[in-house]
């Protein structure tokens, strides 16, 4: 039966170009495997004092609460339920909001939307409705009893002990995506939790007896042993975080702890891979977002910015338009990042070099930092079905840059990101198969042929070698830019050799191949010692701090 179905599927794909289950195209994990842990732990210590209110969060909630009610049929996936959430949170238009909720009916079914599940994606709606139930369900002044009953009995459509990982109506052939599993099964689990906590003793809704607790625990644990499949995804990272925030706030102690650890893992990666909320990592899904170059488009940044405003509204946070919807969710939920996930976004200590593995068929994240800068590698696509979007290698400073074009960056070969292997980052050095791009507001203090030196803020020097098919960027702190350029050019006088090998100021020899196949790290060796270039085998979190 499954074979017949699969063959029919292929025929449909070939003849009609229909929207097929996402896993066929590589959007979902098809195999489970634990990555080596590496030598970096996930920090979870929390000693910081957080404010209960934030002027920024209040303004976000107020803006959403002031919006007219959106059409349920057309905008019920995300916009309409968020307006309801904001109104209840702001305690605004309560009678009208309750009346609106009571008039609603489910607008679809859960799971990925495709040919045999055309009404899918209702789990996006469920996630926000679940937030509403738990935040306001016991406050009859805000959520009337009849409204709560309608929410539980009509609108929250998933309950019981079924834990569905596969795309609906795919005969179990295709795994659904992480965000769909978390939204659907998290909402199912939490409806059970609500019913059990409010007097329903049926084993069907007991998450321990029906197996949901264990299945969800195992799934969440997998996200911190295998890593996220949809890492840094635009737009799906936002919905993954929203589902995790529900579980962290409203689950059992076990599930709350599991969800918090996943969030802490994600935020630790964000902290080490960003500088003052500038974050531009490689991502899996979606290709349509590959053209985005502004840092405000990062959905994770929307959450992080909102959380940090609860720490201190005077932090040096960038003034920019953020992904509005996710600032609302972050404003309403109690989770706050661990201490180190806050600290290391702004303070890089004496610097570090870190590598985050994402498993077979993926691309890693690679970052090297000094006290006041961060070099961010861009990764490599691993074939069309990998759904991986590589990014330029970027140098981040504490200068308030708002887009890639305001940073020193490099990529190559060509402008076709599918051809890039931008993994060439190592200990303050970056190389790529294309020229280095310098914003006009940076002017060199010295030029020697294809070499140039830039004296940047915070006593940072950037040395650049750039030609049509090769670029090199070296970053140092507290050196004389002109003298440093003279020293480095003297050590690397052979420009042909420079395209495969670099000698550092302390005589270390770094070899690289900027045309490496995408399954390999561009950096080959250090002082003749071969490095592990097979990125499929890299640990989850590995690195060295100075």
Please report, for each region that a protein language model flagged, where it lies by residue.
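Sec-dependent N-terminal signal peptides
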Residues: 4-12
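Ser/Thr/Asn(+Pro)-rich, low-complexity disordered segments
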Residues: 21-183, 208-216, 309-546
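Catalytic cores of extracellular degradative/oxidative enzymes
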Residues: 48-62, 70-78, 84, 201-202, ...
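Eukaryote-skewed repeat-based solenoidal scaffolds used as protein-protein interaction platforms
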Residues: 133-237, 241-271, 276
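Extended amphipathic alpha-helical segments with heptad-repeat/coiled-coil character used for oligomerization
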Residues: 245, 257-322
